[in-house]
């Protein structure tokens, strides 16, 4: 490839190293991802985003077939819904393990190993002979598939300067978010066909295998300490004054101890950083609610509107359209407002400048979920609740994207572990909320059930104005010290 040849040329002819002095180069440095050609960066973003998309696609892939699976395995709908809960819990534990591991061994090997196992795990899921087998392999599928989700934010922080990062973060988080909305559209028709629900997972295997092929070809290492270590290993000894991170290698650590430390690190960061706690509560609540709606969505159309599974699956298009529409609205507006705040601040950007769009997003999500719930409750013409679900999807994107970018901007190269801490709480709520879907709407009906969810989100979202005004002071009072973790 042209970009790679440029980097190789620079590597061999332009870099001269004298121990204890900086490495000089007149062209893009293959060991500094921020200087790579834009096309090389975008290729990494596309591969990582595809991994994350398919991981999230797998989250709701069997939602339209819950009744079919329950019938085959002679189980209740709630027990089968555990397939979504355990998958999300697998993603949670994956974030605990894979994000810090990538900060020891690099991003690329973690991506490739984890995603290879994820693809292969679709085989035993499709061949499950009982519910226990189905649930166990769903958990491990979520665990190993989480490599894109747990390290994506960190990879983008590796690749782009803060001023250029916003639009790529929006693309990444949008692709991440539309996966659960697209999967049921396809699965809805599979569930009512004669080929069986198993093909929902065969299709996921095919898509994952195709993406894995391109990942092996195109994905590059981006984590700076790992690249710097390789750089100094090639051009000279590491001096005493070089960063400690460059002297650490995985060979010096016992695997068991490393995994234990890896699981502890994101939790420790989360609990010690007030801004992360606020962000985690807000993102966790809205993520749990969107997961709850996705699981209950097809049943709403079947019970209230007598739609077939295939047509009920098509209704997920409204959520997906809302997600896409928010990108074209939120991305330019949020970036312009961020640039305005930077200019007003004398050209210096602050992480808190990412937050204003989140205020709007939470408000829209609450409007959308109330409109969806009450119109479905009274069986108003089907187009009206789809408007509510579209607004809800847009509100989700407009809330989660700015908050995720806020975490990335605040923690830089340690954003993988910081984001993992937030995702732990987010995924925990995402795993728990769907379990309550059936009982919530049965006892309170769709109207009052959605009203309760809206009030919970309102309470959590009150932290955003506080963070916008006092976030910098809070960060200065509790500065992040990576050596403590």
From Swiss-Prot:
It comes from the Eukaryota. The chain crosses the membrane at residues 79-99, 117-137, 139-159, 170-190, 199-219, 275-295, 313-333, 355-375, 380-400, 421-441, 448-468. GO terms for cellular component: Golgi apparatus; membrane. The keyword Transmembrane helix applies. Disulfide bonds: none annotated. It is found in: Golgi apparatus; Membrane. Pfam families: MFS_1. The keyword Lipid biosynthesis does not apply. GO terms for molecular function: transmembrane transporter activity. It is a multi-pass membrane protein. Belongs to the major facilitator superfamily. CAR1 family. This is Uncharacterized transporter SPAC750.02c. It comes from Schizosaccharomyces pombe (strain 972 / ATCC 24843).
